[in-house]
């Protein structure tokens, strides 16, 4: 069956797209309508406004959902299960405690930042905060320093790991939309995340922690050792590295003088879904069964870890519908040449789209979905090298992280846990998130020079 082609009047299409995006923002910001419904309404407005046949609009909606989820649904689910076991087993706590021991109190910010970065690649940001923030409070209590001095590096690491390094949902989503294999995304994402954590966590955390003294939360005295024996550091780190190593080996094996059979095996084992399946099974055995968890307990942990996944996938799918509606209506072929003539780097355009949506809507996932979807409709983007598109992924993820303020749930989560007012949260957390975005943009532009 031949795919329906459609050519809209350029002016009509531009107006329809503008109206659709404005309606999307108004529905979310003004009327507080759920992003999933808002994006579906916006997509239909764009298609109908552009004059697309009704049958084509419905076909595009179905195609948008299918094509968007086919490369990411399983990865997000597996990654969530993997992170759930890591969290409940005490693996995240072990990483933090060991690094704090090695670095010492004077460099505890580094230890917490690196812990956040490692854990942020595998667990949702909110879960990472709940599990690890007591450790930041513990160090602050011992040193009598501002809680911001230790909390900001930890939060920066969590945010950077989640934004840039697979198998986190955000990085996988953007890489999938722009056709970047996860091995390349990992190789670009890790140094980007490290630099962002250094600038926004260590440097900014030290500055703001010395400038603003924040007391320990009132209930910090209630945080006690629950007596649970934690898994060893080497075991936890080894399990965390399984998916990263397998995916990287798959990518690098193509450039190694290896027998064809070995390359095929490495390529197969490094398929993201299989690498994460192996990692999840390893986590279940080494961090679960061998440490006394029953099958029923593990099932309960996995079920609980999957609760947030459905909503995230619905948001991603709805954003994918807008992306395909824009693509099938021909918008990419219109704005692509216009943007090329503007002389602006494509990476800069991608960053600005992401940061505008993030500041307007508040959701980083919506911003990532929208920005990557819009950029993917432009033929000029898909003609660039894999490395360039990986750098663009980091710019998008950075833009979608920046400018967290009162319309972002993360803003209130951090303020509540640290027991600080909105003004202090803006001065510390919001600037930290924005520094992550700006630093990621600079790193992405530098990488693009060599792409």
Question: What residue spans do the PLM features occupy?
Answer:
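Hydrophobic core segments of alpha-helical transmembrane domains in multi-pass membrane transport
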Residues: 16-28, 40-49, 76-81, 116-120, ...
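Membrane-interfacial loop-to-helix junctions in multi-pass transporters
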Residues: 11-15, 54, 66-72, 99-114, ...
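Long, contiguous bundles of hydrophobic transmembrane helices that form the permeation core
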Residues: 2-11, 187-300
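Juxtamembrane and boundary regions of transmembrane helices in multi-pass small-molecule transporters
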Residues: 145, 180-228, 398-451
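Juxtamembrane helix-boundary/capping and inter-helix hinge elements in multi-pass membrane proteins
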Residues: 50, 87-92, 102-106, 139-150, ...
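Short helix-coil transition sites and intra-membrane helix breaks within transmembrane domains
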Residues: 30-35, 69-73, 83-93, 119-133, ...
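Hydrophobic transmembrane alpha-helices that form the pore/transport pathway of multi-pass ion
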Residues: 100-188, 360-398
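Core transmembrane alpha-helical segments of multi-pass membrane transporters/permeases
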Residues: 37-40, 44, 60-93, 268-330
């Amino acid at each position: 069956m031949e795919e329906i082609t459609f050519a809209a009047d350029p002016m009509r299409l531009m107006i329809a797209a503008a109206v659709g995006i404005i309606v999307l923002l108004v529905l979310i910001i003004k009327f507080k309508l759920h992003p999933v419904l808002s994006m579906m309404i916006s997509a239909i407005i764009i298609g109908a406004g552009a004059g697309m046949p009704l049958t084509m609009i419905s076909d595009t909606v179905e195609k948008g959902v299918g094509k968007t989820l086919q490369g990411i649904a399983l990865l997000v689910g597996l990654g969530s299960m993997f992170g759930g076991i890591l969290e409940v087993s005490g693996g995240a706590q072990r990483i933090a405690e060991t690094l704090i021991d090695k670095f010492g109190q004077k460099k505890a910010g580094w230890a917490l930042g690196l812990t956040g970065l490692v854990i942020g690649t595998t667990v949702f940001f909110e879960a990472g905060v709940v599990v690890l923030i007591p450790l930041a409070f513990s160090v602050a209590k011992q040193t009598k320093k501002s809680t911001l001095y230790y909390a900001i590096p930890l939060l920066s690491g969590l945010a950077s790991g989640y934004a840039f390094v697979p198998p986190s949902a955000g990085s996988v989503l953007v890489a999938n939309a722009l056709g970047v294999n996860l091995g390349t995304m990992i190789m670009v994402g890790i140094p980007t995340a490290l630099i962002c954590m250094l600038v926004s966590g260590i440097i900014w955390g030290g500055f703001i922690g010395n400038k603003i003294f924040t007391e320990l939360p009132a209930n910090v005295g209630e945080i006690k050792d629950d007596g649970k024996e934690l898994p060893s550091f080497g075991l936890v780190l080894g399990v965390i590295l399984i998916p990263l190593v397998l995916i990287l080996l798959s990518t690098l094996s193509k450039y190694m003088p290896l027998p064809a059979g070995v390359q095929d095996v490495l390529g197969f084992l490094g398929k993201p879904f299989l690498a994460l399946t192996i990692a999840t099974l390893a986590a279940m055995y080494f961090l679960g069964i061998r440490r006394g968890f029953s099958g029923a307990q593990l099932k309960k942990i996995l079920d609980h870890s999957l609760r947030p996944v459905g909503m995230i996938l619905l948001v991603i799918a709805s954003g994918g519908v807008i992306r395909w509606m824009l693509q099938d209506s021909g918008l990419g072929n219109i704005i692509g040449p216009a943007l090329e003539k503007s002389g602006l780097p494509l990476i800069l355009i991608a960053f600005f789209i992401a940061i505008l949506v993030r500041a307007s809507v508040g959701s980083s996932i919506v911003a990532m979905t929208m920005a990557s979807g819009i950029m993917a409709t432009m033929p000029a983007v898909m003609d660039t090298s894999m490395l360039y598109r990986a750098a663009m992924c980091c710019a998008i993820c950075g833009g979608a992280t920046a400018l967290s303020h009162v319309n972002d749930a993360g803003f209130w989560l951090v303020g509540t846990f640290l027991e600080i007012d909105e003004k202090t949260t803006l001065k510390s957390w919001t600037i930290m998130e924005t520094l992550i975005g700006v630093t990621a943009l600079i790193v992405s532009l530098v990488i693009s020079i060599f792409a």
